[in-house]
Amino acid sequence: MGKIVISENVSLDGVVQDPTGEEGFRHGGWFGQVGDKDREEWAKVEFEEALGAEALLLGRRSDEYFGPRWTGRSGEWADRLNGLPKYVVSSTLVNPEWSNSTVLKGEVVNEVSKLKQEPRRGNRRLRQPSARAHTDEHDLVDELRLMVHPFVLGAGERLFGETSDKKSIRPPLRPDRR
Protein backbone atom coordinates (compact mmCIF):
# COMPACT_ATOMS: atom_id res chain seq x y z
CA MET A 1 0.00 0.00 0.00
CA GLY A 2 1.22 3.51 -0.76
CA LYS A 3 2.08 6.00 1.92
CA ILE A 4 0.99 9.62 1.55
CA VAL A 5 3.51 12.07 2.98
CA ILE A 6 2.84 15.80 3.10
CA SER A 7 6.07 17.76 2.93
CA GLU A 8 5.49 21.47 3.36
CA ASN A 9 7.32 24.74 3.97
CA VAL A 10 5.45 26.71 6.62
CA SER A 11 5.89 29.86 8.70
CA LEU A 12 5.80 29.71 12.51
CA ASP A 13 2.14 30.69 12.45
CA GLY A 14 1.21 28.04 9.89
CA VAL A 15 1.14 30.09 6.67
CA VAL A 16 2.00 28.21 3.47
CA GLN A 17 0.97 30.91 0.99
CA ASP A 18 3.41 32.39 -1.53
CA PRO A 19 6.76 31.36 -0.04
CA THR A 20 8.65 32.68 -3.08
CA GLY A 21 6.79 35.99 -3.43
CA GLU A 22 5.63 35.28 -6.99
CA GLU A 23 1.89 35.26 -6.24
CA GLY A 24 1.67 38.88 -5.11
CA PHE A 25 0.70 38.11 -1.50
CA ARG A 26 1.79 41.08 0.64
CA HIS A 27 3.70 38.80 3.03
CA GLY A 28 5.08 36.59 0.26
CA GLY A 29 8.74 35.84 -0.32
CA TRP A 30 9.45 34.60 3.19
CA PHE A 31 11.19 31.45 1.98
CA GLY A 32 14.01 33.44 0.39
CA GLN A 33 14.68 35.36 3.60
CA VAL A 34 16.37 32.48 5.40
CA GLY A 35 20.15 32.42 5.57
CA ASP A 36 22.41 30.46 3.24
CA LYS A 37 23.20 27.80 5.85
CA ASP A 38 19.50 27.18 6.53
CA ARG A 39 18.80 27.02 2.79
CA GLU A 40 21.59 24.43 2.39
CA GLU A 41 20.09 22.31 5.17
CA TRP A 42 16.65 22.64 3.58
CA ALA A 43 18.08 21.48 0.23
CA LYS A 44 19.65 18.40 1.86
CA VAL A 45 16.34 17.39 3.42
CA GLU A 46 14.40 18.00 0.19
CA PHE A 47 16.94 16.00 -1.80
CA GLU A 48 16.69 13.07 0.64
CA GLU A 49 12.91 13.19 0.37
CA ALA A 50 13.11 13.13 -3.43
CA LEU A 51 15.33 10.06 -3.29
CA GLY A 52 12.88 8.32 -0.96
CA ALA A 53 9.72 9.16 -2.91
CA GLU A 54 8.11 6.84 -5.44
CA ALA A 55 5.86 9.47 -6.95
CA LEU A 56 4.69 13.04 -6.54
CA LEU A 57 1.07 13.94 -5.93
CA LEU A 58 0.36 17.55 -6.80
CA GLY A 59 -2.44 19.95 -7.47
CA ARG A 60 -2.57 21.84 -10.76
CA ARG A 61 -1.00 25.03 -9.37
CA SER A 62 1.92 23.13 -7.86
CA ASP A 63 2.43 21.21 -11.08
CA GLU A 64 2.42 24.44 -13.09
CA TYR A 65 4.90 25.97 -10.63
CA PHE A 66 7.38 23.11 -10.24
CA GLY A 67 7.24 21.59 -13.73
CA PRO A 68 8.85 24.47 -15.65
CA ARG A 69 11.41 24.99 -12.89
CA TRP A 70 12.69 21.41 -12.98
CA THR A 71 12.21 20.39 -16.62
CA GLY A 72 15.33 22.09 -17.97
CA ARG A 73 17.60 21.25 -15.05
CA SER A 74 20.13 18.45 -14.82
CA GLY A 75 21.88 16.74 -11.96
CA GLU A 76 20.89 14.01 -9.55
CA TRP A 77 18.09 15.94 -7.82
CA ALA A 78 16.57 17.22 -11.08
CA ASP A 79 16.91 13.83 -12.77
CA ARG A 80 15.12 12.22 -9.84
CA LEU A 81 12.21 14.66 -9.79
CA ASN A 82 11.84 14.69 -13.56
CA GLY A 83 11.88 10.88 -13.68
CA LEU A 84 9.34 10.27 -10.92
CA PRO A 85 5.73 9.49 -11.82
CA LYS A 86 3.56 12.51 -11.07
CA TYR A 87 -0.14 12.48 -10.29
CA VAL A 88 -1.81 15.85 -10.76
CA VAL A 89 -5.22 16.42 -9.18
CA SER A 90 -7.13 18.83 -11.41
CA SER A 91 -10.54 19.28 -12.99
CA THR A 92 -9.18 21.71 -15.62
CA LEU A 93 -5.71 20.50 -16.66
CA VAL A 94 -5.65 18.44 -19.85
CA ASN A 95 -2.03 18.03 -20.93
CA PRO A 96 0.48 18.50 -18.12
CA GLU A 97 3.88 19.60 -19.38
CA TRP A 98 6.04 17.95 -16.72
CA SER A 99 7.30 14.52 -17.77
CA ASN A 100 5.66 11.33 -16.48
CA SER A 101 2.50 13.15 -15.36
CA THR A 102 -0.98 11.69 -15.11
CA VAL A 103 -4.00 13.91 -14.49
CA LEU A 104 -6.45 12.67 -11.85
CA LYS A 105 -9.75 14.27 -12.83
CA GLY A 106 -12.11 12.56 -10.43
CA GLU A 107 -13.05 13.50 -6.91
CA VAL A 108 -9.86 14.11 -4.87
CA VAL A 109 -10.60 11.70 -2.02
CA ASN A 110 -11.51 8.82 -4.36
CA GLU A 111 -8.48 9.36 -6.60
CA VAL A 112 -6.03 9.55 -3.70
CA SER A 113 -7.64 6.51 -2.05
CA LYS A 114 -7.06 4.53 -5.25
CA LEU A 115 -3.41 5.57 -5.30
CA LYS A 116 -2.98 4.49 -1.69
CA GLN A 117 -4.30 1.04 -2.53
CA GLU A 118 -1.64 0.44 -5.17
CA PRO A 119 1.21 -1.68 -3.84
CA ARG A 120 4.26 0.55 -3.40
CA ARG A 121 7.42 0.30 -1.40
CA GLY A 122 8.06 4.03 -0.96
CA ASN A 123 6.35 7.30 -0.25
CA ARG A 124 4.24 9.61 -2.30
CA ARG A 125 4.59 13.27 -1.53
CA LEU A 126 1.62 15.57 -1.56
CA ARG A 127 2.16 19.29 -2.19
CA GLN A 128 -0.90 21.40 -2.71
CA PRO A 129 -3.00 23.09 -0.06
CA SER A 130 -6.46 22.63 -1.62
CA ALA A 131 -5.94 18.94 -2.35
CA ARG A 132 -4.27 18.54 1.03
CA ALA A 133 -7.35 19.81 2.84
CA HIS A 134 -9.46 17.02 1.33
CA THR A 135 -6.93 14.33 2.19
CA ASP A 136 -6.51 15.58 5.78
CA GLU A 137 -10.25 15.56 6.35
CA HIS A 138 -10.52 11.92 5.24
CA ASP A 139 -7.45 10.52 7.04
CA LEU A 140 -5.53 9.72 3.86
CA VAL A 141 -2.27 11.29 5.07
CA ASP A 142 0.22 8.96 6.74
CA GLU A 143 2.94 11.41 7.64
CA LEU A 144 3.38 15.16 7.91
CA ARG A 145 6.85 16.67 7.42
CA LEU A 146 7.12 20.39 8.10
CA MET A 147 10.01 22.69 7.34
CA VAL A 148 9.21 25.52 9.74
CA HIS A 149 10.66 28.89 8.77
CA PRO A 150 11.35 31.52 11.47
CA PHE A 151 8.71 34.06 10.45
CA VAL A 152 5.32 35.06 11.84
CA LEU A 153 3.31 36.41 8.92
CA GLY A 154 0.02 37.15 10.67
CA ALA A 155 -2.12 36.45 7.60
CA GLY A 156 -2.33 34.14 4.62
CA GLU A 157 -3.41 30.64 3.63
CA ARG A 158 -2.73 28.32 6.55
CA LEU A 159 -1.50 24.75 6.54
CA PHE A 160 -4.70 23.74 8.29
CA GLY A 161 -7.80 25.76 7.56
CA GLU A 162 -11.10 25.24 9.28
CA THR A 163 -12.09 21.62 9.80
CA SER A 164 -15.42 19.99 10.49
CA ASP A 165 -14.14 18.74 13.84
CA LYS A 166 -11.11 18.79 16.11
CA LYS A 167 -8.32 16.71 14.58
CA SER A 168 -5.71 14.75 16.48
CA ILE A 169 -2.36 14.56 14.73
CA ARG A 170 -0.70 11.26 15.54
CA PRO A 171 3.07 11.54 16.03
CA PRO A 172 5.27 9.11 14.09
CA LEU A 173 6.32 5.97 15.92
CA ARG A 174 9.97 6.96 15.49
CA PRO A 175 10.26 10.73 15.45
CA ASP A 176 12.84 12.13 13.06
CA ARG A 177 15.40 13.92 15.20
CA ARG A 178 17.65 15.59 12.66
Regions found by a protein language model. Give the residues of each.
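Portal/gating segments that form or line small-molecule/metal binding sites
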Residues: 1-140, 150-178
